[in-house]
Every structure is written in C-alpha cells, then in structure tokens.
C-alpha cells in the first residue's frame, strides 16, 4: 500500500488516495467540537449494556442526519444499530460500542471523586469507541461522495460488549455475512494495531433452589441454596490447580438470601470461564458444571444452569494491521499539552511504579524500560504481540471468525493505570480522551478508504483470514436460538441505579 496510489474518479481526472483521505480528515477537523460534544454526552449518559437507550439514539440520529439509512433495534436488541451509506461493493464495516461499567463513576479530575456514588462510568472508553466509528463512517461517506467513488460504508452500533456480547447476536443474525472487512478501535494506553488474540470465554449463571426455614428454630427443615452456591465455589477453587495455567475462572454471588435467620431457598452465582482457545474453554466448562451438580446433591437443592453464551478467541489480521499502522503514521499521534501531562502525572500517583513495570513486562512491550517514567504515550508502535493472547475477552472476536477484522488501539488511559477503573473514566471524559477520539477517527477513516479503493488489500486480508482459520468454522455457543437477555439487563440496570 502507498499513499500515492492513483485511480480514476467518476470524471476523467486522476485522484490520489491521499486526496480522498484528506477530505475525510478535513470533515473530522471541521466537526471536532460536535464530535467531542457527542463523546462527552455519551460519557455522561454512562448506560448499562443492552440499556444504552440515550447513547444509541444520539448516534443513530447523528448518522441519519448525515444521510445514512439507519435501523435501530436490529438482532433483537433495542439499542443495536445498523446504518449504511452508498451502494455496491466493497462493503466495509466499522463498529462502535457505547456501554458503561458499574461502580466506577468519577468526575473529570485526576483523583478518585465519584460523579455519582457507586454509579456507572466509562471505564473502558466506550464513549470514545462509539463516537470514533460514527465519526469515521460519516467522514468516509462525504469523501466518497466528493470524488464520486462507489462502495458501501456500514456502521454497526454494538451494545453490551462488557456483559452480554451484543455482536454475537448480530453475527448469529447474519448481519455480517456480506461484509468484506471490519475495522474497530478501542481506547487504551498505547497507539498500536495489535496482533494478539484474546481469551475465549463462557458466561454462565447457576441458580439453586432449596427450602426456607427458621435458621435457629428448625434449620433441619431447610435446604440452603446459599450453601450450594458456596460449596460449588469451594469445589471450583480446588479445581483451579488442575486446569491449564492460562485459564481464568471468576465469579460473583448475585443472590445469597435476604437475612441470616432465614434459610435461603434461592441463591445464584455468575461465572466467567476463560482460556486462550474455544476448544480449551469447553472442557473446563463441563467440569465446572459437574461441580455445580455435586453441590446440588450435597445440599439436596435443585440446580438450573443458565448458559448465557460465550465468546470466541480473536483471529488477528496482519494485513489489516499493516493498513491501520500506515494510516496511524500518516495522521500522526496526538500532541499532549502541559495540562494533559499534569493531569496524567496526578493520576499516576494512584498506582505504584512496581505495578506499572509488572504490566509492561507482562505485556512484553519492547524496550519497556523507556516507558517506566512515561504517563502518556506519544509514539506509534509497530505491533509486537503476534502469537500472544491478551487476558481479556471481546465480542469483536466472534466477528473475526466470519470476516477479516481488527480492533486497533490509541492512547487514552494513563500508562500503568488499570482498565475498568475510575482513572480510565476520568481520562475518557478529558481532553486526553478527546485527542484520542480525533486521532482514532482519522486513522479509521483512512484505513476504510484504503480498503474501499484497493481491491488487492481485501484479497490479501481474506486469504490471510482463511489461512488463520485452518478450516475451523464458527459455531454458536450454547443455544443458537437464544435471545438477548433484555429483561435481565433491565433488572440489573435498575438494581445498579438503586445502589447509586
């Protein structure tokens, strides 16, 4: 790929791809204030997954006002968006997320000060995530129109990445079947189009049903559902020694009874089971279920297993990484102001240098020593992580099993600060987050335009994708006919509001 590639437009003149990109980038620059306002508005909404009513409506309305054909409520999710402009091939997709996380609300200040006590916050930067994809899609639309170029730009608004994997339902509904390639962006603490995979995961709830009784007067008549939950947890914790080193199993007790003097007749736990590959998760999941059944036998309770689904491991794309990295370098990384650096330095006081070093080493960052005293990364890195597996999981992975896809990162969080934290919330609403947004939007727009105007790039990406799959085929996890858990999401969202 070269930025000097030329091709015929709708007239007789020659067009360079850099001319088309600069048109898209100019639209982003001209609308910088509007884009940051949308980003900040979504930051303020901070809505739970599958309940992102205001955030999704804002994005959908903005796309509609800019000429996109918009469908809101696809794949059985009221907050899922499918919007497109143009016609014909190629069809290039962008993806935007806009769900927030519970318990990490914070003001845009470099210390812990909740905006709402125990409230929701964008501790993974999804206010930036969704706005970036929206902005890039609109910018591409105007660039294509300006030069009379064909093809279709399609925006996917994907709810509930953090809890229910909204993209999975969109994949199962066939909404990606005609797409040629897909580009996503995620705020992070580095500027890189990475090549690591992600952990596959299963999400499952275990519901136990027993009998109530007076815990002091006649406990022999009770059968404690909470005992079953606790015995199951003990069993799983003993099992940890006997699974692969890379596996991760974590849980919360969602319901444990009302008060101590009543034997609880209902209790439940929510588990995540992760491993680097789907075929490693499944056997661990079966063992966890056996432990759950054993706990029910020991306590004479009834068990209901609610396998809410899971996620695949990500299929990386060197071809798409090269395209994105080249566009990152064309755009240039953000320049941090003195105010940005002071803000970041204050946040850096909230964690230790030792934990930062541990993180850099764990992520195998090249020449990690030079980043020990860096708070905001200002350079663009070449991907170093091919063959590695990141600790987290993402529903972008499920998309990557059906089409070539990538999710690149731009620096937004303070280097060394944890994800899903008040620190990330503060950065996501600050000028640091705004600069990450603009950089990412331009990078995504340029990358999409390369794919739309260079057929060879798409051929290369598709050939690599097929090779990496090694003949494996995407199959639904759990019940293929399951529906998004809308009622459950609303109940959780209401409960979280009650805590706030």
Whereabouts are the PLM-identified features?
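Metal-dependent amide/peptide-bond hydrolase catalytic core
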Residues: 230-500
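General structural feature for long, well-ordered alpha-helical segments within catalytic domains
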Residues: 20, 31-34, 38, 51-62, ...
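Divalent metal-coordination and catalytic microenvironments
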Residues: 42, 83, 94, 126, ...
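N-terminal amphipathic/basic-hydrophobic helices that include classical n-h-c signal peptides
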Residues: 1-18
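Acidic/His- and Gly-rich active-site-bordering loop/insert found
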Residues: 20-122, 127, 131-152
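Short Gly/Pro-enriched turn/cap motifs at secondary-structure boundaries
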Residues: 71-73, 161, 194-198, 386-390
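Histidine/acidic-residue-rich, glycine-tolerant segments that coordinate divalent metal ions
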Residues: 79, 101, 109-121, 127-128, ...
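Conserved short loop/turn motifs at secondary-structure junctions
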Residues: 47-48, 156-160, 308-313
């Amino acid at each position: 790929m070269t930025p000097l590639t030329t091709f015929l437009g709708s007239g007789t003149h020659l067009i360079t791809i850099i001319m088309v990109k600069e048109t898209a980038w100019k639209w982003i620059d001209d609308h910088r204030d509007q884009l940051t306002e949308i980003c900040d508005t979504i930051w303020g909404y901070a809505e739970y997954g599958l309940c992102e009513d205001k955030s999704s409506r804002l994005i959908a309305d903005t796309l509609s006002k800019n000429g996109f054909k918009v469908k809101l409520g696809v794949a059985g999710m009221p907050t899922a968006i499918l919007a497109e402009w143009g016609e014909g091939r190629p069809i290039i997709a962008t993806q935007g997320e806009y769900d927030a996380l519970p318990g990490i609300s914070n003001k845009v200040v470099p210390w812990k000060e909740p905006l709402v006590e125990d409230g929701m916050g964008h501790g993974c930067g999804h206010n930036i995530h969704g706005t970036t994809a929206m902005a890039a899609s609109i910018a591409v639309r105007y660039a294509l129109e300006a030069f009379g170029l064909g093809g279709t730009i399609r925006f996917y608004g994907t709810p509930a990445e953090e809890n229910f994997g909204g993209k999975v339902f969109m994949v199962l509904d066939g909404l990606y079947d005609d797409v040629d390639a897909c580009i996503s962006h995620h705020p992070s603490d580095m500027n890189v189009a990475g090549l690591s995979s992600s952990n596959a995961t299963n999400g499952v709830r275990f519901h136990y049903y027993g009998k109530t009784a007076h815990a002091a007067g006649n406990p022999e008549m009770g059968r404690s559902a909470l005992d079953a939950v606790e015995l199951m947890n003990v069993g799983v914790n003993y099992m940890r020694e006997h699974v692969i080193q890379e596996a991760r199993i974590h849980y919360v007790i969602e319901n444990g009874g009302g008060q101590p003097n009543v034997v609880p007749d209902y209790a439940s736990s929510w588990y995540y089971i992760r491993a680097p590959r789907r075929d490693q998760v499944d056997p661990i999941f079966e063992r966890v279920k056996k432990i759950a059944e054993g706990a029910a036998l020991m306590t004479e309770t009834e068990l209901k297993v609610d396998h809410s689904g899971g996620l695949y491991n990500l299929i990386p794309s060197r071809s798409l990484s090269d395209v994105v990295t080249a566009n990152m370098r064309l755009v240039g990384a953000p320049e941090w102001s003195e105010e940005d650096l002071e803000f970041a330095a204050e946040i850096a006081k909230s964690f230790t240098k030792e934990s930062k070093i541990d993180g850099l080493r764990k992520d195998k960052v090249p020449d990690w020593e030079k980043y020990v005293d860096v708070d905001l990364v200002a350079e663009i890195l070449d991907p170093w992580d091919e063959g590695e597996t990141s600790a987290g999981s993402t529903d972008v992975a499920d998309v990557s099993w059906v089409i070539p896809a990538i999710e690149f990162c731009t620096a937004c969080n303070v280097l060394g600060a944890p994800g899903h934290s008040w620190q990330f919330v503060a950065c996501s609403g600050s000028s640091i987050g705004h600069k990450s947004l603009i950089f990412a939007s331009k990078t995504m727009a340029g990358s999409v335009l390369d794919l739309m105007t260079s057929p060879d790039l798409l051929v290369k990406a598709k050939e690599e994708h097929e090779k990496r799959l090694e003949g494996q085929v995407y199959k639904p996890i759990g019940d293929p006919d399951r529906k998004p858990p809308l009622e459950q999401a609303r109940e959780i969202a209401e409960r979280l509001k009650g805590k706030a």
